Amino acid sequence: MIKVLVTAIGGGGHGDQILKALRLASPGRYRIFGADANPSCPQASLVERFVTLPLARDPNYLDVLLRTCKELGVQALFHGCEPELQLFCANRKIIEGAGIFLPINDTALIQLCMDKAKTNARLAALGFPAPNYVNVTSESELEGIDWFPVVVKPAVGGGGSANVYVAQDMKELQALAVYLGLGSITSGFMIQEYVGTPDQEFTVGVLHDLDGRYVNSIAVKRHLSSGLSVRTSVANRTGRKELGPRLVISSGVSQGDIGRFPEVTSQCRAIADSLGSRGPLNIQCRFVDGKVRVFEINPRFSGTTSLRAMVGFNEPDLLVRRHLLNQDIGQDAPFQEATILRSLVETLLPRGGATGVPA
């Protein structure tokens, strides 16, 4: 049995998703250990052994992590949040030097995708149509923007739609700049053109092995109609009817129709190939006039990893089988097509313990 450690399994992030996917793999393949900074982690009952780790920004984090891996005999290490992804990336040689399989993408690609403006620029240079965008650091730089509505978001960092806003005209954009403290509280942010309609939105996974060989791709056509999946929904007052009656930003919690969607995944595979992906890659996009319009790329396992595993496309398991078990995992293996919906799950934690019991 392969001993794996999944970090940051609490909080409903992609660590939780990786854990769920590994639990869906063939029985007897894994001994799964879990870690989180929160000792009262609801997922603690789902792993063979749970350990509490410091936050990734703690200077002792790496030492504690490596000591934990040695004590548990960990063979494969999965990150569960983006601060850990960046730390694992920066310390790849140390972790791999300890004999631990680290299924993360290429260092240069991770660094590129953490900067949204640089990602957009690279896509444009490679010939893929990206929405208009600009990084701004002062209010005077807003004056040249004439492609409303726009999405205002942090220029660096990861997904989850955190701190993302919609501005429908210059007045709203200037008000947002004041609200966000442009030039004072924040040094800058990215402004990106809002494109397409909510029913054209996809989250797409393109998997390559760590040697850069293409494995498979899958898409979730998002259902952006519930409070769980929607961060922002406002009436469209721009007069641009092609954008639909409402302007909608996803919360990052994806649910919907899952399948091949070849018209979408083929274009996303071309993007991943061109970027030189070596590992998991997740592309957030809208499909407009026959073209994929990318608004974000996350070079990691997705918040839909367990959904993909439910239909037979288990990315964490595939990478372990390919690189640790030396199995032939093929290419474009078939998987089920389905609609997968999500809901909240309550967990009862007995006082004095961190063993979770789903209600």
Predicted regions and their residues:
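ATP-dependent carboxylate/phosphate-activation module, predominantly the ATP-grasp catalytic core
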Residues: K171, V178-G181, E193-G276, N298-R321
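Preference for protein termini
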Residues: M1-A35, K70-G73, L210-G212, S226, ...
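ATP-dependent carboxylate activation and anion-phosphoryl transfer catalytic cores
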Residues: L72, D257-A359
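ATP-binding N-terminal substructure of ATP-dependent carboxylate-amine bond-forming enzymes
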Residues: M1-I104
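Active-site nucleotide/adenylate-binding loops and adjacent lid/helix of ATP-dependent enzymes
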Residues: I110-P198, H208-R213
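Short glycine-enriched loops at secondary-structure junctions
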Residues: D36-P39, E82-E84, R213, V220-H223, ...
